[in-house]
């Protein structure tokens, strides 16, 4: 992505110079580790600021009062590590759960270098989700269909945690499928990075209808 586009993303987010420098460091780390760990689609590295950074930053605007975040299947730290970097000055803390040990190595090293308030957990989601009660927001990007996301996050969504799940053009079909099993209170927020994408914001979840 060109420098003017980088500047546009940073200006729109309204981040400080120090935060911009930390995001630059994250991008440098992503490019350095990509050939070894295959963290993101190779073609997206040329659009890293719009495809990844801005896509993550928009979640902060949807929960401006949230301080504790849980990112599931963190992978390359999108959105979780980016949220930690950008939210650092407002007191945000993010837990990153990732089952791939190699990706956890990237997350741990990059969190250290950027001084991001993030804790990396090398574990399977279903094994640890119960430990994160009271979290303000749980999020996951490009991880699983809505039915599976709701199954994993049920203990949190039923007790006041908000869910933010970026989705693509098939979001309505995913919600229809999930609706056969769950009573979900949600709204769809248009993505500012993709006209066909939506962010599913879940504010309440009831038990599956067959229980």
UniProtKB/Swiss-Prot annotation:
The keyword rRNA processing applies. Its main location: cytoplasm. It catalyses: guanosine(527) in 16S rRNA + S-adenosyl-L-methionine = N(7)-methylguanosine(527) in 16S rRNA + S-adenosyl-L-homocysteine. It holds the Pfam family GidB. S-adenosyl-L-methionine binds at residues 73, 125-126, 141. Keywords: Cytoplasm, Methyltransferase, rRNA processing, S-adenosyl-L-methionine, Transferase. Belongs to the methyltransferase superfamily. RNA methyltransferase RsmG family. Specifically methylates the N7 position of guanine in position 527 of 16S rRNA. This is Ribosomal RNA small subunit methyltransferase G. It comes from Methylobacterium radiotolerans (strain ATCC 27329 / DSM 1819 / JCM 2831 / NBRC 15690 / NCIMB 10815 / 0-1). The gene is rsmG.
């Amino acid at each position: 992505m060109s420098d003017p586009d980088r500047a546009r993303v940073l200006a729109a987010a309204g981040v400080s110079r120090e935060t911009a420098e930390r995001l630059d460091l994250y991008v440098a780390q992503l490019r350095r580790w990509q050939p070894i760990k295959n963290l993101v689609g190779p073609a997206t590295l040329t659009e890293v600021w719009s495809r990844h950074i801005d896509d993550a930053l928009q979640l902060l605007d949807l929960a401006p009062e949230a301080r504790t975040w849980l990112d599931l299947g963190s992978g390359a730290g999108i959105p979780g590590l980016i949220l930690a970097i950008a939210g650092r000055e407002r007191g945000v803390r993010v837990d990153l759960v990732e089952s791939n040990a190699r990706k956890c190595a990237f997350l741990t090293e990059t969190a250290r270098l950027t001084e991001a308030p993030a804790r990396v957990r090398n574990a399977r989601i279903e094994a640890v989700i119960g430990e994160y009660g009271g979290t303000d927001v749980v999020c996951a990007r490009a991880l699983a269909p809505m039915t599976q996301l709701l199954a994993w996050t049920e203990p949190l969504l039923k007790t006041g945690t908000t869910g933010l799940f970026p989705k693509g053009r098939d979001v309505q079909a995913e919600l229809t499928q999930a609706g056969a099993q769950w009573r979900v209170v949600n709204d769809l927020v248009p993505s500012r990075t993709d006209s066909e994408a939506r962010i599913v914001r879940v504010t309440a979840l009831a038990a599956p209808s067959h229980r």
